[in-house]
Amino acid sequence: MNSEELWAQAKQLFAGGVNSPVRAAVKPFPFYVERGKGAYIYTVDGKKFIDYVLGYGPLILGHSPESVKRRIVEQLERGWLFGTPSELEIELARKIRSHIPSAQKIRFVNSGTEATMAAIRLARGYTKRSKILKFSGNYHGAHDYALVEAGSAATEYNVATSDGVPMEIMKTVEICEFNDLDCVDKKLRNEDIATVILEPVMGNAGVILPEKDFLFGLRELTKTYNSLLIFDEVITGFRISIGGAQSYYQIYPDITTLGKIIGGGFPIGAVAGKAEIIDNFTPAGKVFNAGTFNANPISMIAGIATIEELEKEYPYIIANQAAKTLVEELERLLKTKHTINHVGSMFQIFFGIDEVRNYSDAKRADKEYYIKFHERLLKEGVFIPPSQYETIFTSAAHKDDVIADTIDKLMKVIGELN
């Protein structure tokens, strides 16, 4: 069956035809992928795309890297779920702790959503406070406390504050704009906020960077008012550096949430932080967390194998240079008003606007022009996120020949749009 036929079936089986809403943003219907290798994905329709979505971030080595695949196959021969601890969870935790400065102890879960949900509960349990402070357009997963002025597909489908989130929960969530320290200072003064949670680099409203001293200011304010600081590094962890955004900016939170890359493309999440805080999780403490698939062997071995490759440094050299080259070429080629926010191997283009420093700015960008840009690139065999409010990623598989091919296609598309 081709993609159109599969889409017709999917609409009869799933709400909106998909199991995660951003997938429906590709028009007139999503294409269905049957395999991926390196920088490419291949559809059931026989089409080949250069992939800059990369599973929305986890695939920093590209699709199906041999070094990771081999270890997964070996583990499958031994078994994939036991309901007991395994040595693999110790090995992956040690690797994470060796690179993430704030990670004294770790609790593995199964997704970024689970990680932020557990981290918020942990912060409340530790501080004995009920409120949290988050930032407009920061996306921390699909649970109630996160779906208040959320980014990602929540913005794309105009449900930044989701139906079904009780008003009682909304009242426990304070909101500030990203990069606004004065707002944070005012909100924290009542000393009733358990935690300030943020993406240190916003990756779900496009890419939005922290301004100078913003992260430092948050660290100082949370210390002053006895609130915990949570960095949601589900996207940035092991991406903008092997030590994440906290190493890149040298600002260290009390709690870090991780996901995506640490599972090598398999479901995973983690809550990491100071031992005295993490030890409040059951069975050591009274903050409950559990999961049938927590620290499952397949996710553990995929994460170990991925980090082992990242420790060789070459993936960062290739992926970062690929992004840098693409950004430079886009700046050279684009004649329309725009801005590009970029760090490491992640970037996003905002059309019709000179600066994007927060969620309000991102929403003023020309979304319709971005959609045209996406659609024209898709016709040329280049897959970037279908939503303005996502991130363009590069990987270790995006080598010089792939980038040269992409630039040729960009020249054609931008020439037509200009």
UniProtKB/Swiss-Prot annotation:
Keywords: Cytoplasm, Isomerase, Porphyrin biosynthesis, Pyridoxal phosphate. GO terms for molecular function: glutamate-1-semialdehyde 2,1-aminomutase activity; pyridoxal phosphate binding; transaminase activity. It is an enzyme of class 5 (isomerase). The keyword Isomerase applies. One of its GO terms (biological process) is protoporphyrinogen IX biosynthetic process. It is found in: Cytoplasm. It comes from the Archaea. It catalyses: (S)-4-amino-5-oxopentanoate = 5-aminolevulinate. Inhibited by gabaculine. Its cofactor is pyridoxal 5'-phosphate. Pfam families: Aminotran_3. The keyword Hydrolase does not apply. Its EC number is 5.4.3.8. Pathway: Porphyrin-containing compound metabolism; protoporphyrin-IX biosynthesis; 5-aminolevulinate from L-glutamyl-tRNA(Glu): step 2/2. Belongs to the class-III pyridoxal-phosphate-dependent aminotransferase family. HemL subfamily. HAMAP family: HemL_aminotrans_3. Homodimer. This is Glutamate-1-semialdehyde 2,1-aminomutase. It comes from Saccharolobus solfataricus (strain ATCC 35092 / DSM 1617 / JCM 11322 / P2) (Sulfolobus solfataricus). The lineage of its organism: Archaea, Thermoproteota, Thermoprotei, Sulfolobales, Sulfolobaceae.
